[in-house]
């Protein structure tokens, strides 16, 4: 792990630069090749250890897959160091620390926001409730994989155009939000099928916690969009403030609501906490933009973003109704897929134009 902590940032920095320069083919190829080689190496080691009847196969598999990744990361580390020809630069370190130290507070608060509900359910209810809640929380969060990819592609475009007076960022951001809202909603409507496939019948009884969790998870895209602005203007302390407020809200609400309404209440307290996070970061970003660019400047169409966020949450929560009507639910899923395809096509078309 220590070796990984040392060399993995080189890969992250390299990947961020490739995305910023729109070199997705190279980044995607290296990522895919590394993953393939790591998987093949792990399989070969496991088969060899089983054939030799060796113990500790799990550690063998772990070392095999990680060694391949760390070799790739190490090569990139040496390339970056060689090209930079500098190990320590006071100006760079000062800039990085000023930008990153508040984000440590954000990361800690985000971790509290993410796991506090499960820890409190364990203490206030029982471990079986934790198992059910954790499984459905994980399923509800699958859409974050989609948003992570979207956000990674959007950040370079945002930072290259944020100083422009054009309104293209407003249009592009709403398209991306709309596409992600469709993904989050469709995942919510597919909840019965997903839970039946991945879990036992006792988990199915708790599918009604998925809509509020999915609505809260969707708001991650709103908070990320506004936190991107604060990172650009080097005001990361505001990100920390908003995340601490959200984490504190979640812990306080869980303390009272889980005891009174049971573990399912944690899904709704999570939604409220994410609303606090998104709203807090939107307000902070507005304050930062006002200081940096003037009172009337806004990067996004804030009213449209707020309206879309409300609509997305309501759409996710409507799953509480549609779970009882399979035919109507499938009809909504088909319509959502069609709308998602149209939005996805428009996003891809705009991305090609920007490149």
What are these regions (language model features)?
Residues 55-59, 95-99, 103, 121-141, ...:
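Interfacial/gating helices of multi-pass transporter permease domains
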Residues 40-49, 75-76, 147, 170-220, ...:
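Alpha-helical transmembrane segments of multi-pass membrane transport and lipid-handling proteins
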Residues 28-83, 245-249, 263-285, 332-333:
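Hydrophobic alpha-helical transmembrane segments
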Residues 136-166, 170-173, 227-232:
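Helix-loop junctions and terminal segments of transmembrane helices
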Residues 7-29, 215-245:
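Membrane-interface junctions at transmembrane-helix termini in multi-pass inner-membrane proteins
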Residues 54-62, 71-114, 153, 157-167, ...:
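Interhelical loop/hinge segments that connect adjacent transmembrane helices in multipass membrane
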Residues 65, 69, 246-249, 298-353:
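Transmembrane alpha-helical segments of multi-pass transport proteins
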Residues 46-50, 108-142, 192-202, 260:
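Helix-terminus/linker motif at the lipid-water interface of multi-pass membrane proteins
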């Amino acid at each position: 792990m220590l070796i990984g902590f040392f060399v993995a940032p080189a890969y992250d920095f390299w990947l961020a630069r490739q995305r910023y320069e729109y070199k997705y083919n190279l980044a995607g190829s290296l990522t895919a090749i590394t993953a393939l080689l790591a998987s093949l190496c792990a399989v070969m080691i496991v088969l060899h250890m089983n054939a030799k009847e060796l113990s500790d196969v799990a550690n063998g598999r772990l070392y095999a897959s990680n060694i391949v990744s760390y070799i790739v990361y190490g090569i990139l580390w040496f390339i970056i160091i060689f090209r930079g020809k500098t190990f320590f630069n006071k100006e760079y370190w000062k800039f990085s620390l000023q930008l990153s130290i508040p984000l440590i507070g954000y990361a800690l608060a985000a971790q509290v926001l993410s796991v506090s509900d499960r820890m409190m359910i364990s203490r206030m209810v029982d471990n079986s409730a934790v198992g059910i809640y954790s499984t459905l929380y994980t399923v509800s969060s699958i859409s974050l994989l989609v948003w992570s990819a979207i956000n990674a592609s959007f950040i370079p475009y945002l930072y290259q155009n944020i100083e422009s007076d054009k309104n293209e960022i407003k249009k592009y951001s709403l398209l991306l939000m709309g596409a992600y809202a469709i993904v989050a909603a469709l995942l919510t409507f597919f909840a019965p099928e997903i839970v039946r496939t991945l879990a036992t019948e006792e988990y199915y009884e708790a599918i009604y916690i998925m809509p509020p969790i999915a609505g809260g998870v969707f708001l991650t895209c709103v908070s990320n969009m506004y936190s991107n602005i604060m990172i650009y203007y080097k005001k990361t302390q505001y990100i920390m403030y908003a995340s601490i407020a959200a984490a504190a809200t979640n812990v306080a609400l869980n303390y009272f609501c889980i005891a009174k309404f049971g573990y399912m209440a944690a899904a709704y307290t999570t939604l409220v906490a994410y609303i606090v996070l998104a709203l807090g970061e939107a307000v902070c970003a507005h304050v930062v933009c006002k200081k940096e660019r003037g009172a009337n400047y806004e990067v996004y169409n804030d009213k449209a973003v707020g309206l879309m966020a409300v609509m997305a949450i309501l759409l996710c929560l409507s799953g509480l109704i549609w779970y009882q009507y399979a035919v109507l639910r499938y009809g909504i899923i088909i319509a959502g897929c069609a709308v998602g395809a149209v939005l996805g096509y428009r996003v891809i078309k705009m991305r090609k134009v920007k490149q």
